[in-house]
Design a protein with these regions (language model features):
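Extracellular/luminal Protease-associated
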Residues: 63-160, 165, 331-332
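Soluble metallo-hydrolase cores and metallopeptidase-like ectodomains found primarily
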Residues: 64-96, 155-233, 244-257, 281
């Protein structure tokens, strides 16, 4: 931690320190006996600079600001306009109001992420964005951040349709709250100049691998690039954890049924997941055939956290919660369904994901405007004292427990009844007003899939018990079950967690991503839309999405039937 934060600060993708960090990660892995390699690729990254901002009416006030990454630069004379407070910046904040021609004021919570706040502001006709920091009301830290919605490097299509289109700046919470109070008294006009260089640069990721007894493997990773400053929690701490896990697992390589791939990504902060998406794209065949799970480690052991927070695809939930209970005992813990944030570039591929770390209490979050990553997040205040090194030891033990079971279990520790239940619950929730789409048939297939999942889970439990009682048991059945579980995840994860599906990436923070089966997100709107062109086009889209759901659930039921038939 000290080495990274003091000798390689400001690890921006495309910078010399970004390259040095990639080389340091490779050297640390090599020293631990792990084969490592640095890969270089072109990345569309951003080098934002300090912005200039002031209130011009009703009084003139200068405000310290940072240009946000991938902001559109303003012209030399800047941008001025009337300010409108849109709070979280989500769609519902605009209801009954017009942002056309105005500059929006929003606050940093990740509901939605900055990237989505910008996208929504543009859709609503705004001309620019001012985003205030989170934290306690006295927080004077001026945040960095990115507003590029395109996940990874753009394609010709997404470059035209998903890149940021507005100039955006970040300001301290103290300044944002002052603007909010001024708006309560009447109109406020602001001016700002956004200064940024956006362009293609060579960027680097580091990948290390410990081979197991079979061709299958688990991926553990996190981003190694950072904003200016030490950025201790984000993500020097995560990188240090992966290095230590690699060192320990390398000493146990002869016991690993599955290998361990260690990924140190880049372009997370200033390129929106360039490194991890490149890795998935360029290792697709091997990942699709042999990757069993992805553990993301990003911002572990923030100072002041006391609970345990885990987010996963639900097929992993039972196994990782059991590991957490063994290691953490009575420490409060909670779970949420994994959504596509951080380096969740494996969703389209269909590899289930787990991310977990310490969390603040609800009371602490209320006091800090939902600063779940610390008031210092994305600022130069992110120094090494923002880490709880005692809690870090618990993090390492939990991560090791996750990886050990994933790498050594004879039968993968997945269960699919919970997956089926999520589909059933969501489809039932969406059914009112969805008659035109034929959702009943898809819901019926979800119930049939659940019955098949019950049979699969029972069979897997039976075989786990057999293998536990005899180390000499033939593992043919395990191979058949594991192959089925991987194929199920390949089909179910993209359906449950993406709108675009397997071969594209939804924009970062995309609002439908917060829901189960994002492709059906607009079903409630269909019932409220009058007959006419808009409704007919939306209905066409949703019928096709419904067909995708029905087909995947039916295909998964058939996979299970075929697997159980083979086992019998």
């Amino acid at each position: 931690m000290e080495r990274i934060t003091t000798t390689i600060p400001s690890r921006l993708a495309g910078s010399e320190n970004g390259r040095r960090m990639a080389e340091y990660s490779a050297a640390a892995l090599t020293k631990a006996g792990v084969a490592a390699r640095v890969f270089e690729m072109p990345g569309l990254v951003s080098f934002p600079e300090p912005a200039e901002m002031r209130v011009v009416a009703p009084v003139e006030i200068a405000i310290e600001a940072n240009t946000l990454g991938h902001s559109v630069p303003t012209l030399a004379d800047g941008l001025s306009g009337e300010l409108i407070d849109v709070a979280s910046g989500a769609f519902h904040e605009y209801e009954g109001r017009s942002a056309v021609g105005k500059i929006t004021l929003s606050e940093l919570s990740y509901h939605p992420a900055r990237h989505e706040k910008q996208r929504i502001s543009a859709l609503m006709g705004a001309t620019g964005c001012v985003m205030m920091n989170w934290g306690h009301p006295e927080n004077t830290a001026v945040p960095f951040g990115s507003v590029k919605p395109v996940w990874g490097n753009p394609t010709p299509e997404t470059y035209k349709t998903e890149m940021a289109t507005l100039p955006c700046v970040g300001i301290a919470r103290t300044a944002g709250l002052k603007l909010r109070e001024m708006l309560k008294a009447g109109p406020v006009r602001v001016w700002f100049r956004a200064n940024v260089e956006n362009g293609w640069r060579p960027v680097q990721i580091t990948v290390g691998e410990i081979e197991g007894q079979t061709s299958d493997f688990v991926v553990v990773g996190g981003h190694q690039d950072s904003w200016p400053g030490p950025q201790a929690t984000d993500n020097a701490a995560g990188n240090a954890c992966v290095m230590e896990l690699a060192r320990v697992f390398a000493q146990c390589r002869d016991k690993l049924r599955r290998g361990l791939v260690c990924g140190f990504w880049t372009g997370h902060e200033t390129g929106t997941m360039i490194g991890s998406s490149w890795y998935v794209d360029h290792n697709w065949d091997r990942l699709r055939e042999h990757a069993v799970a992805y553990l993301q480690i990003d911002q572990p052991a923030c100072a002041g956290t006391s609970r345990w927070s885990a987010a996963s695809n639900v097929e992993l939930k039972r196994f990782h919660q059991a590991a957490e209970k063994r290691v953490l005992g009575a420490r409060p813990a909670f779970w949420r369904r994994a959504v596509k944030n951080g380096d969740a570039s494996f969703f389209g591929l269909g590899v289930p994901m787990l991310a977990a770390q310490g969390a603040f209490t609800e009371d602490e979050l209320k006091k800090t405007a939902l600063a779940n990553l610390g008031w210092w997040h994305h600022s130069v205040e992110n120094t090494i004292d923002k880490l709880d090194f005692a809690f870090m030891q618990d993090h390492l033990r939990v991560y090791a427990a996750y990886l050990w079971e994933l790498c050594t279990a004879v039968v993968l520790p997945f269960e699919f009844v919970s997956v089926a239940d999520q589909f059933i619950e969501r489809l039932e929730e969406l059914k009112p007003g969805a008659e035109a789409v034929g959702l009943d048939g898809a819901a019926g297939r979800a119930r049939v899939f659940r019955a098949a999942a019950e049979r699969l889970d029972r069979s897997a439990e039976d075989w786990r018990a057999r293998y536990a009682s005899s180390s000499a048991a033939d593992e043919t059945a395990a191979e058949i079950l594991n192959a089925c579980m991987k194929r199920l995840s390949r089909a179910l994860v993209p359906l449950a967690s993406t709108a675009k599906g397997a071969y594209g990436h939804d924009p970062y923070g995309y609002t439908p991503q917060g829901t189960m089966i994002p492709s059906l997100y607009d079903l409630p709107r269909l019932a409220k839309t009058a007959e006419g062109e808009e409704r007919w086009m939306l209905e066409t889209q949703l019928v096709r999405a419904r067909n995708r759901v029905a087909d995947v659930l039916d295909d998964c039921r058939r996979m299970i039937d075929d697997t159980l038939r083979t086992l019998s």
